């Protein structure tokens, strides 16, 4: 009995001594531990996620995200679900079908790819036929006022609703005069385009129960929805969730318009745009809220500011290293056709030229960062399917 009591006393004093030691160490090291926590949090908690599906919405900075994903695929030797044949999109504006992917045949063996990011209209059952079960799904949204303005300039000659109207302001003053649902899928660019890209009816009434149900559908399917107006914060959060390196998400803005081809709506025009694209407006408002809530939960304000600053510093460093004159150029100034962006509608799309005199390794790094979407799609297609005829990009001969 006495022996047992002695053992208990020794155990008690050992625990007390340990508690005092921990308390003293915490007092001395409190400041240093707090300083180290951001670094410890930045450590990847596992291998990088390599199965990724990005729903590339229109006029939302999505071409820059596509470049990030293409670069990651190329540097890690991953397979990409690329458009079949001479297509440069995955069947858009029709709902996606698996057969729109090169290498997938109806009735043939199953094909699975690591990355999917070219334009498509979302159709989950068909996407699942070509992507693994553990795929990370994400997308990006933009304020529909500015998304619609960009669509108007970019698709002016293509969209029936835009073709005969002098300005977006005039269109929004009387949209029913120009917009006709019966004119087909091309008009999807003129109303609730992001809603349409998600696979929903862009002409549906914005009734509360319907909208809430569709928002819940998006939340169930997509692990993350980014916001174009906060692109750097979006990339920090994406990097965190995918467990990627900083350089994996550093980018230069692609498919960027010159300031002269950007128009501003009046306050009244902006309100009309929100009403006309009411589904997109509800979509954007909802996921803008969830985006910031996710940032607070995953990172917190201090770590977010720190990582955004790191991202921006690295972008400036690479821009100074890679880009001739450190700034984007218009089409006529870009002599390398591999880097010349596609021009559409009334938009003046800017691109980049590389600084001369770069060594081969740096040229490869920089060229990947500034290669436009169509040329990059064509290059990856040739790499993955060398036995197929290469994709023809007609405007490169212009």
Swiss-Prot record:
Glycosylated residue positions: 77, 133, 180, 288, 330, 360
TM stretches of this protein: 12-29
Its EC number(s): 2.8.2.-
Top-level enzyme category: transferase
Major subcellular site: Golgi
Membrane topology: Single-pass type II membrane protein
GO CC terms in record: Golgi cisterna membrane
InterPro entries linked to this entry: Gal-3-0_sulfotransfrase, P-loop_NTPase
Entry's localization field: Golgi apparatus, Golgi stack membrane
Key words, A-Z: Glycoprotein, Golgi apparatus, Membrane, Signal-anchor, Transferase, Transmembrane, Transmembrane helix
Lumenal side: 30-398
Functional pathway: Protein modification; carbohydrate sulfation
Cytoplasmic side: 1-11
Keyword Transmembrane tagged: yes
Activity modulation notes: Strongly inhibited by Cu(2+) and Zn(2+).
GO biological process, one term: glycoprotein biosynthetic process
One MF term in the entry's GO annotations: galactose 3-O-sulfotransferase activity
Top-level lineage group: Eukaryota
Keyword Transmembrane: yes
Chain's role: Transfers a sulfate group to the hydroxyl group at C3 of non-reducing beta-galactosyl residues. Acts both on type 1 (Gal-beta-1,3-GlcNAc) and type 2 (Gal-beta-1,4-GlcNAc) chains with similar efficiency.
Entries under PANTHER family matching the protein: GALACTOSE-3-O-SULFOTRANSFERASE, GALACTOSE-3-O-SULFOTRANSFERASE 2
Family the entry assigns: Belongs to the galactose-3-O-sulfotransferase family.
Protein name as catalogued: Galactose-3-O-sulfotransferase 2
Protein's organism: Sus scrofa
């Amino acid at each position: 009995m006495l022996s047992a009591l002695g053992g208990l006393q020794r155990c008690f004093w050992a625990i007390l001594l340990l508690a005092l030691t921990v308390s003293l160490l915490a007092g001395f090291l409190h400041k240093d531990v707090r300083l180290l926590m951001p670094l410890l949090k930045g450590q990847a908690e596992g291998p990088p996620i390599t199965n990724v599906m990005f729903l590339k919405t229109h006029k939302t900075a999505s071409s820059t995200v596509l470049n990030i994903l293409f670069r990651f695929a190329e540097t890690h030797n991953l397979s990409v679900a690329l458009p079949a044949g001479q297509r440069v999109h995955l069947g858009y504006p029709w709902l996606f079908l698996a057969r729109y992917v090169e290498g997938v045949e109806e009735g043939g063996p199953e094909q699975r790819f690591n990355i999917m990011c070219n334009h498509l209209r979302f159709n989950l059952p068909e996407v699942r036929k070509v992507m693994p079960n553990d795929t990370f799904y994400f997308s990006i949204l933009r304020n529909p006022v500015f998304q619609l303005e960009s669509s108007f300039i970019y698709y002016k000659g293509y969209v029936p609703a835009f073709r005969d109207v002098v300005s977006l302001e005039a269109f929004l003053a009387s949209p029913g005069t120009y917009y006709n649902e019966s004119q087909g899928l091309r008009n999807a660019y003129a109303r609730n385009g992001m809603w349409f890209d998600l696979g929903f009816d862009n002409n549906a009434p914005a009734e509360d129960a319907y909208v809430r149900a569709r928002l819940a559908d998006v939340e169930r399917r997509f692990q993350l929805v980014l916001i174009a107006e906060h692109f750097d914060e979006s990339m920090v959060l994406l990097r965190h969730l995918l467990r990627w390196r900083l350089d994996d998400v550093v980018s230069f803005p692609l498919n960027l318009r010159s300031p002269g081809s950007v128009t501003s709506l009046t306050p009244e025009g902006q309100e009309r745009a929100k009403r006309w694209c009411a589904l997109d407006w509800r979509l954007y408002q909802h996921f803008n809220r969830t985006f910031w809530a996710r940032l607070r939960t995953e990172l917190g304000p201090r770590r977010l500011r720190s990582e955004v600053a790191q991202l921006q510093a690295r972008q400036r460093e690479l821009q100074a290293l890679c880009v001739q004159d450190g700034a984007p150029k218009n089409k006529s100034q870009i002599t390398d056709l591999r880097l010349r962006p596609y021009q559409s509608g009334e938009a003046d799309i800017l691109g980049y030229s590389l600084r001369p005199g770069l060594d081969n390794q740096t040229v490869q790094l920089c060229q990947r960062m500034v290669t436009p979407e169509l040329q990059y799609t064509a290059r990856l297609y040739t790499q993955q399917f060398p036995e197929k005829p290469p994709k023809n990009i007609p405007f490169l001969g212009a």
